[in-house]
Amino acid sequence: MITVVLIFSAYLLGSISFAVVASWLFKLPDPRSYGSRNPGATNVLRTGKKAAAAVTLLGDAGKGWVAVAAAKYGGEVWELGDEVIAGAALAVFLGHLFPIFLAFKGGKGVATSAGILLGLNPWLGVLTISTWMVVALVSRISSLSALLSALLAPLYAYFLLEKGILIMAVSIISVLLILKHRLNIANLMAGKEARIGKSS
């Protein structure tokens, strides 16, 4: 029962869209109505409101970290297996991608996945985020940074995580993130992908 509660709570937490929350707080248009129409930090940044984008980024990453941290704590208290941690990680990510509060139409999960990785292993999170930052600095393309980071995250996880089920969870999250970027991949191949801070 505790396992079900932890995983379902993680999904509900993931369903909270901080892009929508931040846009409401800063009196901005709904992020689903402009730019890439993606409720994420990069799209919110297109409004020019860096503070709103920061709130979105920290909120989306924070919920990923909290879900994993709660599962770890619950696992210790109730002596649950690593399956609960993996389940919570996947649930919070799926909540962000398919939020019940937004008719199951959510974001692409970049910030949330970063929070999840930090929760699983700080070095895993730091390595993946560093990969994103380096690619972003060179290319100024958020989606390319996310895609390369997603490709490398399972490799980092293989060396940093001891449990196979956690490595599997990271791999599934990476695959889902890449699938969510299908349109971005097409735009990248066509040379039409927007750069960070620019209109889509």
Swiss-Prot record:
Family designation:
Belongs to the PlsY family.
- Subunit and interaction comment: Probably interacts with PlsX.
- Principal EC category: transferase
Cellular localization per UniProt = Cell inner membrane
Pathway recorded for this protein: Lipid metabolism; phospholipid metabolism
Q: What are the GO MF terms of this UniProt record?
A: acyl-phosphate glycerol-3-phosphate acyltransferase activity
Entry membrane topology: Multi-pass membrane protein
Gene Ontology annotations of biological process type:
phospholipid biosynthetic process
Give the protein's recorded name: Glycerol-3-phosphate acyltransferase
The superkingdom of the source organism is: Bacteria
Explain the purpose of this protein.
Catalyzes the transfer of an acyl group from acyl-phosphate (acyl-PO(4)) to glycerol-3-phosphate (G3P) to form lysophosphatidic acid (LPA). This enzyme utilizes acyl-phosphate as fatty acyl donor, but not acyl-CoA or acyl-ACP.
Q: Which reaction does it catalyse?
A: an acyl phosphate + sn-glycerol 3-phosphate = a 1-acyl-sn-glycero-3-phosphate + phosphate
Q: What is its EC number?
A: 2.3.1.275
Pfam families, sorted: G3P_acyltransf
Membrane-crossing residue ranges in chain numbering: 1-21, 84-104, 116-136, 159-179
Origin species: Nitrosomonas europaea (strain ATCC 19718 / CIP 103999 / KCTC 2705 / NBRC 14298)
One GO CC annotation: plasma membrane
Q: Keywords for this entry?
A: Cell inner membrane, Cell membrane, Lipid biosynthesis, Lipid metabolism, Membrane, Phospholipid biosynthesis, Phospholipid metabolism, Transferase, Transmembrane, Transmembrane helix
